[in-house]
């Protein structure tokens, strides 16, 4: 990465702004390879499960069931707080047929969800009557749980189907009695003022195999009926279905997903209005940061930072100050004794790169005087000669 650096002993390239990739535009508040873009949080990965032992969740996961208690769950067929009749056996929660659905006490929206489940070892029934349950996202969108190991049924009702809407891309089930894993990325449909502003999608991996690829959520799932568009809530519980079979679950956890562009996220292409607002916010933050770098003995760090703010949003006072600082820098360089000026070769070439960047992305015009004068100095000193 090209970073603009000064010759000051206490400043490094990493301390100074980067003038590198394409500048922000009307739909992207960040520059390409933007040094101001926040670093992603560090997450310690978990471990994979075996049949004998559930894996360890990642460090930022919210644990919904760890094999020891049902304190985060309640019955779905009663008032809030009604205890479930599901039971815990050997580190797994087991559906008691006829007891009703179970749901989380908490509600959440867009998530990465991990669920492990096992149908009974003893095979009983066929088609939809064999090891049937379901994982309901927001309590509305069912990812089918079913023992389809050598057990055909209608495709949009097989294990890992978005029930009644999308058949799985593959049948990657293990034999009955063994634990299966679902890893789900769920993005709910987003509604504002009664209108859908962002569709919902779900991606599912079954035992590590991609079986739902960014499948469009057409509405609430249901049996024998076509899904219809509907207003989705921003948050809802996770539900597990009682379909009359003693299906077991273990190692259930989720990670909240970051907001999308339509709800304030800043990754991807934003609206013109949202981009403008974010760029103004970034420019103001960078200007505030520049104030901390003010140092008459070494003005370059402050000048670079102020100049960088102009890449995000124009500000007349800041533009004027950068032009004054740039002119002062070039005048000082020109007036130095030859031996002292020679020591500024690398620094001057870096400053020229900044000026070129600012001109290239229309922060300053082609006639930007400090740039022209600096180029003349560099040429007269043969500093571009290799």
What are these regions (language model features)?
Residues 1-7:
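Bacterial N-terminal signal peptides
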């Amino acid at each position: 990465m090209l970073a603009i650096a000064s010759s000051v002993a206490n400043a490094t390239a990493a301390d100074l702004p980067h003038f590198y990739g394409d500048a922000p535009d009307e739909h992207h508040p960040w520059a390409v390879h933007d040094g101001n873009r926040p670093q992603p949080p560090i997450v310690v990965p978990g471990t994979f499960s075996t049949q004998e032992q559930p894996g360890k969740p990642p460090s930022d996961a919210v644990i919904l069931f760890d094999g020891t208690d049902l304190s985060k769950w309640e019955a779905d067929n009663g008032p809030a707080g009604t205890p479930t009749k599901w039971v815990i056996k050997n580190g797994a929660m087991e559906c008691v047929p006829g007891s009703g659905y179970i749901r989380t006490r908490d509600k959440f929206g867009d998530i990465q969800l991990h669920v492990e489940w096992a149908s009974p070892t003893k095979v009983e029934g066929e088609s939809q009557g064999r090891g049937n349950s379901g994982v309901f996202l927001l309590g509305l969108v069912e990812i089918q749980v079913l023992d389809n190991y050598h057990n055909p049924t209608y495709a949009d009702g097989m294990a890992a189907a978005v029930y009644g809407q999308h058949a799985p891309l593959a049948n990657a089930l293990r034999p009955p009695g063994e634990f299966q894993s679902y890893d789900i990325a769920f993005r709910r449909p987003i509604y504002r003022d009664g209108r859908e502003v962002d569709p919902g999608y779900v991606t599912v991996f079954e035992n590590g195999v991609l079986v739902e690829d960014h499948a469009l959520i057409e509405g609430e799932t249901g049996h024998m009926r076509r899904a219809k568009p509907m207003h989705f809530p921003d948050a809802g519980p996770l539900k597990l279905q009682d379909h009359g079979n003693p299906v077991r679950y273990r190692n259930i956890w989720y990670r909240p997903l970051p907001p999308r562009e339509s709800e304030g996220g800043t990754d991807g292409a934003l609206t013109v209005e949202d981009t403008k607002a974010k760029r103004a916010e970034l420019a103001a933050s960078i200007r505030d940061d520049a104030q901390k770098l003010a140092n008459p003995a070494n003005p370059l760090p402050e000048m670079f930072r102020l100049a960088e703010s102009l890449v995000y949003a124009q500000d007349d006072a800041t533009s004027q100050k950068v032009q004054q600082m740039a002119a002062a820098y070039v005048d000082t360089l020109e007036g130095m004794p030859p031996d002292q000026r020679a020591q500024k070769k690398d620094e001057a070439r870096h400053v020229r790169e900044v000026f070129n960047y600012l001109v290239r992305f229309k922060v300053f015009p082609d006639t930007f005087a400090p740039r022209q004068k600096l180029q003349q100095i560099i040429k007269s000193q043969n500093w571009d000669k290799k």
